[in-house]
């Protein structure tokens, strides 16, 4: 039985390494618990990309500060149940858990129930994506497919395609339009 557990752990570790995704849990970054949660279906057809339009962070410590500030704003000022996004990606190349898997976000009106929301920390009208961020985002999307959160033929949108906004910023917009699942 112990051998089976070790094999399972090794498989999970290798799967994470193959996808190149390290997800920093909400508890690890000091996030608050959601006041409520709505389940999100599996095999969704869409992923929506955002930017937070705030400060850029390039270290784990700085990204944690940004995450805590964004969550406080979303919960305390906007009255939302939690941080709006399912996942966020810092300039340090880490993926940070927001609402996480299988929980409906509050990131794109009329699209929350049919998409996952992924946001980059920073303002990408002025900031530029690093190769680590691009790798993390693509790895996270691959992970979402392998987990059954989104279908393999999912459609990738920038927030501006589903709402009246500049989000996800010009620099992210120009990048994601080159990705295979992006649709005009």
From Swiss-Prot:
Induction: Strongly up-regulated by PGN from B.subtilis. Regulated by both imd/Relish and Toll pathways. Residues 45-169 form the N-acetylmuramoyl-L-alanine amidase domain. GO terms for cellular component: extracellular region. Transmembrane segments: none annotated. The keyword Cell inner membrane does not apply. Its EC number is 3.5.1.28. Disulfide bonds join 57-63. Belongs to the N-acetylmuramoyl-L-alanine amidase 2 family. This is Peptidoglycan-recognition protein SC2. It comes from Drosophila melanogaster. The lineage of its organism: Eukaryota, Metazoa, Ecdysozoa, Arthropoda, Hexapoda. The gene is PGRP-SC2.
